[in-house]
A protein has these predicted regions:
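Glycine-centered flexible beta-alpha turn that most often forms the glycine-rich phosphate-binding loop
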Residues: 7, 71, 109
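Beta/alpha (TIM)-barrel catalytic core signal, keyed to glycine-rich beta->alpha loops juxtaposed to Asp/Glu
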Residues: 1, 79-284, 291-298
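An active-site-proximal structural segment forming one wall of the substrate-binding cleft
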Residues: 52-66
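Conserved small/polar residues in nucleotide/adenosyl-binding loops
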Residues: 303-308
Length: 308
């Protein structure tokens, strides 16, 4: 009814899966479904697993409960360490995912991670077509690590932070260059960024967080986690919000312990250019070319730029 057509189903909760399946009856083709491999429901609780028997059973369950014969994105769940990635990439989980893709039951293979170094390895392997990654202006400042809880730990923001972490910047640029789409999780930092107790020390709005994520290279969609209809409405308000409400640059400039000086955030806040140049897009393409050392495949996008 509101135009939402992309949905992430990380949870293996059988009741939720069945409810979604009933809601999609007669209109499955109108939706892009991202469902996770390696999650199971045991004793009324979610559990991550790499046991191939459990992975197979859970995937069959999600197809049955969603009343469909395919998933658009089969997302390999929660790969935050290099050891886990190596196990997945060279083991039964990836073989199963590839098998399901060949059978047409998975259209694209994805991987979810909070660690930019692991995510980059997955993207560069050529095995992954979609990356689910945590993207927001606070997490983007943090270095790569295998403990995702450090991303929201208070001590991680105790000192002065300057500009985006290079590993994260490289990840986004590589995804753009290789054509790997990013679906965003944690755009609001689990809600932490929307309050005055935010790690940044300043509350951001839903519109600002969504716009920040959507202006990163390669980002295709933001998966807004919602608990209520009101929270869903708040995210949907982004679609009709004016540019002034989406603008996050002024808010980022007020962060007491964070500096973005000398780093383009692709926010467009410097507009209008007296020469009519789309500075944000041109700078993004420049950074992509610098990262690759040559004019990248994304040069085709240059044709969409408006000439002054």
């Amino acid at each position: 009814e509101t135009g939402v057509n992309c949905m992430d189903l990380y949870t293996p909760d059988p009741d939720l899966r069945s409810r979604v399946g009933r809601a999609l009856r007669g209109r499955r083709e109108q939706f892009v479904l991202q469902a996770h491999l390696c999650t199971v429901w045991q004793n009324g609780q979610y559990k991550a697993t790499r046991d191939i028997g459990e992975v197979r059973a859970s995937f069959e369950d999600v197809l049955r409960r969603l009343e469909t014969d395919y998933i658009d994105v089969g997302m390999i769940h929660y790969v935050d360490t290099m050891d886990t990635w190596n196990t997945v990439a060279n083991g039964e989980v990836m073989r199963y995912a590839l098998e399901q893709k060949r059978a047409g039951r998975i259209r694209c293979i994805g991987l979810s991670s909070h660690n930019p170094e692991v995510a980059l390895a997955a993207v560069e392997s050529g095995l992954v077509e979609v990356l689910m990654f945590s993207v927001n202006p606070c997490y983007d400042l943090q270095p790569a690590g295998e403990n995702c809880e450090a991303l929201w730990a208070e001590e991680s923001y105790a000192g002065m932070l300057v500009n985006m972490d290079p590993a994260r910047e490289r990840l986004y640029e590589t995804c753009q260059r290789l054509g790997v789409g990013i679906t965003v999780m944690k755009a609001f930092g689990g809600g932490d960024l929307l309050t005055a107790d935010s790690p940044a020390g300043v509350a951001l709005t839903v519109e600002q967080c969504i716009h920040y994520a959507l202006t990163r290279p390669a980002v295709a969609s933001v998966m807004s986690g919602v608990h209520t209809s009101a929270e869903l409405a708040a995210s949907l308000a982004y679609e009709t919000a004016p540019d002034s409400a989406r603008d996050y640059a002024a808010a980022l400039a007020t962060f007491p312990k964070i500096s973005w000086r000398g780093h383009c955030m692709y926010c467009g806040h410097c507009a209008p250019c007296p020469k009519g140049i789309d500075v944000a897009s041109v700078t993004k393409f420049l950074n992509l070319a610098r990262a690759q050392g040559m004019v990248p495949e994304t040069a085709v996008s240059y044709t969409h730029l408006t000439l002054p």
